[in-house]
A protein has these predicted regions:
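Acidic, serine/threonine- and proline-rich low-complexity intrinsically disordered segments
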Residues: 1-2, 39-190
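Accessory beta->alpha helical hairpin/"wing" motif in late/C-terminal subdomains of nucleic-acid enzymes
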Residues: 2-35
Length: 190
């Protein structure tokens, strides 16, 4: 009888389902668990995994941010996506993951800005200015915020399970920065 066991990478990846599990775990390890990013930057990074529908003319295939650390880390993720897409194609593997539109580059800085908003007036202004300019609907934005929250929860569990304390302490602060106005129990939308 054969006994199958997870590799260390596979054990960590088995806790991830909101994003490409192997890419995320490899990326987190190579970036030393995002030690150089703060909570806001982590939100910007995670926003690339949302499916917030930005107006076609304003959509970008490269990271839309002036933050050099984020650009570098997102390019690393993009390279990993290309590598896995190529591997799956070469070995005729059909994982079901859609590599063609797997990353959304347009909401990085807007999501970082969203983290900084303090009250309802600022949130309303953001919705009427930033989201309207990008032609992003409030429903799509809310779903994107909830997706970020779901990814954060997975990463929190990963950090708790494997003892990545520095990242854990950053991640547990994120929901309070993003789940406001459009994505809370008191919100007007949900």
């Amino acid at each position: 009888d054969s006994v199958y066991t997870f590799t260390p990478l596979g054990e960590k990846a088995s806790n991830i389902s909101e994003t490409h599990s192997l890419i995320i775990v490899e990326f987190l390890e190579s970036s030393n668990y995002l030690e150089e990013l703060d909570e806001r930057e982590i939100v910007g990074l995670i926003s690339i995994f949302t499916d917030i529908k930005v107006c076609e003319e304003k959509r970008s295939s490269i990271p839309k941010t002036e933050n050099g650390n984020l650009k570098r880390l997102i390019r690393d993720i993009m390279d990993r996506f290309e590598t896995y897409a190529r591997l799956e194609n070469t070995y005729d593997i059909h994982s079901g993951y859609n590599y063609d539109n797997g990353l959304m580059m347009d909401m990085i800085d807007p999501m970082i800005s969203w983290c900084d908003l303090q009250d309802t007036q600022q949130c309303k202004y953001f919705i009427h200015s930033v989201l309207n300019e990008l032609e992003v609907g409030l429903g799509d934005f809310s779903k994107g915020v909830l997706k970020i929250s779901a990814i954060v929860k997975e990463w929190v569990f990963l950090c708790e399970t494997f003892g990545f304390n520095e990242l854990y302490h950053k991640l547990i602060k994120i929901d309070e920065k993003i789940l406001k106005f459009v994505a809370t129990t008191q919100s007007l939308y949900i």
